[in-house]
């Protein structure tokens, strides 16, 4: 007997990211991870970024000071966050 159950590829977190609203034009990657509550503090941000565990727009990023702009997507630990302008 064949299995006719529909199988779907798992959705990547980047397909439905949560929003990270920022007031300025740019934010540094380490700050964004903290603001999005993806890490506890700057030390944790440094460790996970330097270990290559964080992706920006689908590419591994190892620079904590990487500047993110509106529209950039951060992925870490199964979560995705999109940098967007804050409502004024």
Predicted regions and their residues:
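Short, structured beta-strand/loop micro-motifs enriched in basic residues and often containing a Trp
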Residues: 51-59
